[in-house]
Each structure stands twice: as structure tokens, then as C-alpha cells.
């Protein structure tokens, strides 16, 4: 299934690129289509590993119109253990408008949705204190939709996302409290979580701040700070930081980023892998190489 989806996206990219080629060759071109293929030593989202600390691939196609309209389709490989039952990939679709001066104030507004085909989990949404048994087992998916606001000044960019879907990547009473109950040696915090009642995480906020410093014509220093505030589940709140270098050479972009997530509840960032439990929130050097067409 994953091969088929990758092949479909590659074919779509090739078709869109061939259609756009005549327009780009014309001085009156009003839009562009760019395809990017990337190989990474680890697929990290907000500094948390989606690929269980293993290598991953990304394929993206971006459409940009001179009016400011943009659209993005991106496929990334992920771990089916991190995202239970998944087909091994997720798909990000986004559209919106960007406007302003790239060297001064610039802005963006849009909508985005992440799909995790096949990914779902069953978890208890309540806990009976009288019997000591979890109850109300329900199925939850990881698919998430966002409203996106971008603000920037020169090389400084901020991105604010608000979760529109019922849950943020499965964050719910079953997803958060259930994970804590399953993996914690002391169930007290999980029971406190359940005691707050049945909640979802719609309305959560994700904020990122990025600054790029040119070191030369080909090399850029990247600085990042971010935070997420998950509605109804303070246990899932955390901040992340990274510092990296991007270098352009031989038609490729080479990058090295040291990512540092600062989480509060380790059980929420652990994955059962056979008879082992692996943490996906460790500090790590992430290497990547990409090519744009």
C-alpha cells in the first residue's frame, strides 16, 4: 500500500511538473510547481520521532501562484508501532495564502490536514474506581486538521496552529490517560487524568519560531523554538528547541539539526516495540539530504 501511494504521488508530481514547464519557460508565468524528495536519518515532528528513531523519507509537491495562493501535498514514512495499525506513512495536505514582503513583514493564512491511513487505537475512556477496571473502550484515529497563521519579519518566522479536529494526533482521554495507565509504574497520575472526565483536544495550540542566519551564499544557520499546549491534557504539553546547519551543494540541500524536546510525561512519548519500550523524545542529531525539481 505504501509503495502504491508513493508511486501515485511521484506520478502526480511528474504530471504537474510537465504541465507547469511551459508556463515557467514563459516570462509571463503566473505559477510554479516544485517537487522535493528528502531522505532523513529520523522523521521528527516538533522534535518527536514519528519513525521510531529510524530513517525515513519524504516526498512533497508544492504549488505557488503569483496571487499568493499556495497548496502542498506531502507524504512521509512513519512507524506503524508509533501510529498503531498505520500503513507506514502519513499524508499532509495544506492550502492557503501568503502575502507581504519576504525581506520585511510577511504573512500567511491557511488550513491543513494530516491523514494517517489505517492508524487507530482502542483505549478505555473511563475508569471504574469501585471495580478497579477501565471502561468505555472506544476507537480513536490520529487524523488531525488545523487552522494556520504565519507571521514573519525578514529571516524570523512564526507559525501558529490551532487544532480544528476533535483530537490532535489521538490526544484524548483514551489516548493520554490510557497511555499513562498502560506504561506508568505508578497509576496515580493516570487515575487523576481519568478523574477529569471524558475530553478531546480540539482547540489545542502549536507555536513555532524559526530564525535563519546566512553564513555564506550556500550555508545557513537555523535556530528553532516551539511549544505545544494540548487542551484538557497538560501532561502532553512540552517545548522543543533545535539548532542546525543547511548547506547547498551539487544541486542538493544537506542539513544537520540537533533537536531537543523538553517533555513532562515520559509515558506519552514511549512506544512498545516487541518486548522493549522505546522513547521517541530523546535529544538527537538528525541528518537529511534533499533535492528539489
PLM regions: where:
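Outer-membrane pore/translocation modules
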Residues: 84-202, 276
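Cleavable N-terminal export/targeting peptides
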Residues: 1-32
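Short glycine/proline- and aromatic-enriched beta-strand/turn motifs that initiate or cap beta-hairpins
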Residues: 25-81, 180-182
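Repeated loop/turn-to-beta-strand initiation elements of outer-membrane beta-barrel proteins
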Residues: 67-73, 102-109, 155-160, 217-223, ...
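Outer-membrane beta-barrel pore domains and translocons
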Residues: 38-42, 74-78, 98, 112-116, ...
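Residue-level signature of outer-membrane beta-barrel architecture
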Residues: 26, 63-65, 97-99, 113, ...
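Outer-membrane beta-barrel "beta-signal"
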Residues: 245-250, 258, 277-293
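Residues that define the transmembrane beta-barrel architecture of outer-membrane proteins
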Residues: 31, 53-57, 87-91, 105, ...
Amino acid at each position: 500500500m505504501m509503495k502504491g501511494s508513493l508511486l501515485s504521488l511521484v506520478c502526480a508530481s511528474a504530471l504537474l511538473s510537465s504541465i507547469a514547464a511551459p508556463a515557467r519557460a514563459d516570462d509571463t508565468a503566473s505559477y510554479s510547481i516544485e517537487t522535493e524528495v528528502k531522505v532523513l536519518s529520523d522523521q521528527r515532528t516538533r522534535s518527536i520521532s514519528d519513525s521510531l528513531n529510524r530513517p525515513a523519507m519524504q516526498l512533497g509537491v508544492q504549488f505557488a501562484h503569483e496571487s499568493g495562493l499556495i497548496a502542498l501535498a506531502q507524504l512521509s514514512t512513519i512507524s506503524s508501532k508509533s501510529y498503531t495499525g498505520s500503513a507506514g506513512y502519513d499524508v499532509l495536505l495544506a492550502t492557503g495564502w501568503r502575502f507581504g514582503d519576504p525581506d520585511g513583514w510577511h504573512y500567511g493564512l491557511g488550513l491543513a490536514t494530516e491523514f494517517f491511513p489505517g492508524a487507530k487505537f482502542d483505549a478505555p475512556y473511563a475508569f471504574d474506581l469501585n471495580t478497579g477496571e477501565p471502561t468505555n473502550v472506544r476507537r480513536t484515529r490520529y487524523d488531525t486538521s488545523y487552522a494556520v497563521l504565519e507571521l514573519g519579519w525578514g529571516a524570523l518566522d512564526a507559525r501558529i496552529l490551532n487544532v480544528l479536529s476533535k483530537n490532535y494526533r489521538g490526544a484524548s482521554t483514551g489516548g493520554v490517560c490510557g497511555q499513562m495507565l498502560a506504561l506508568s509504574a505508578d497509576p496515580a497520575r493516570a487515575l487523576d487524568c481519568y478523574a477529569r472526565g471524558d475530553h478531546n483536544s480540539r482547540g489545542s495550540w502549536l507555536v513555532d519560531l524559526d530564525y535563519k542566519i546566512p553564513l555564506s551564499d550556500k550555508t545557513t544557520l537555523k535556530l528553532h523554538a516551539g511549544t505545544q499546549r494540548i487542551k484538557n491534557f497538560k501532561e502532553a504539553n512540552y517545548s522543543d528547541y533545535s539548532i542546525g546547519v543547511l548547506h547547498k551543494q551539487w544541486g542538493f540541500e544537506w542539513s544537520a539539526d540537533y533537536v531537543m524536546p523538553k517533555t513532562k510525561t515520559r509515558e506519552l512519548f514511549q512506544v512498545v516495540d516487541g518486548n522493549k519500550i522505546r522513547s521517541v523524545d530523546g535529544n538527537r542529531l538528525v541528518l537529511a539530504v534533499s533535492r528539489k525539481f
